[in-house]
Regions:
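Family-specific signature for flavin-dependent thymidylate synthase
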Residues: 1-246
Length: 246
């Protein structure tokens, strides 16, 4: 089978990420009935029909004292579009996560690439483990944009040339950079998401400092907003207890 490339593909450039909550079974009540089975047994099923606001103290207790398993009885599935380098960091998170990503073996990859906008700090100051990022100069911003776009264009032209010559997609993709956009489904529960947020976002309420790469933090912020809407009491307890996963 010969792979047929698209006609005269023109690269496009983005600086954003997108996150869509595609399905969920997640509520604060899920935490409560799971926790209360310890003392109520089958009577804990009654919690499924009660207003969880009555028991927000229990949720806070579980979070504070790090009784984590009740926070696992829920599920959220997100559809995420981001550069490949974001997904390579993302998939370091293995416990409580499931992933399926767009395949460069089975489809022709689209010519959409990441170029940071002016809000992205470009210069790292300090030493490993103790550093900050600061604004780049106008010249640095222009350099990054020009060099990235030139590099992406050359790489994608090489990819297309190989496809046109009949080279398999799984071979031709080797020339493509990690700034290429990919897409994936990621499924987690509240406990695994809290662990992710504790490491991949910065927040003034966090007891433990974190130094995430900005692009994965952008993904985390969007996932956090969706989760906060689904499980507001759990989310409030997470923040009240230093954003440390139980």
């Amino acid at each position: 089978m010969t792979d047929t490339p698209a006609d005269d593909p023109k690269p496009s450039y983005r600086s954003d990420v997108t996150v869509e909550l595609v399905k969920h079974t997640a509520s604060d009540a899920d935490v409560l009935f799971a926790a209360r089975v310890s003392t109520l047994g089958e009577q804990s099923l009654d919690e499924m029909d009660k207003d969880p606001e009555r028991s927000k103290g229990l949720i806070n207790y579980l979070m504070r004292d790090r009784h984590g398993s009740p926070f696992e009885h829920n599920s959220m599935t997100f559809f995420i579009s981001a550069p490949i380098f974001v997904f390579r960091e993302f998939m370091r998170h293995r416990v409580g996560w499931s992933y399926n990503e767009e395949s460069g073996r089975y489809r022709e990859l689209q010519s959409v690439f990441y170029v940071p906008d002016e809000s992205r700090k470009l210069v790292q100051e300090g030493r490993p483990g103790k550093y900050v990022f600061v604004e780049g100069t106008q010249a640095q911003q222009e350099l990054v944009g020009r060099v990235m776009e030139d590099s992406y264009r050359q790489a994608y032209e090489a990819y297309q040339e190989m496809l046109a010559a009949g080279v398999a997609r799984e071979v031709a993709r080797a020339v493509l950079p990690v700034g290429l956009y990919s897409s994936m489904y990621a499924t987690c529960n509240a406990r695994s998401l809290m662990h992710f947020l504790g490491l991949r976002t910065q927040h003034e309420l966090a007891k433990v400092p974190s130094f995430p790469q900005r692009e994965i933090e952008m993904v985390g912020e969007k996932m956090e907003a969706e989760w906060a809407r689904l499980m507001p009491l759990t989310y409030a307890a997470f923040n009240a207890n230093g954003r440390v996963a139980p």
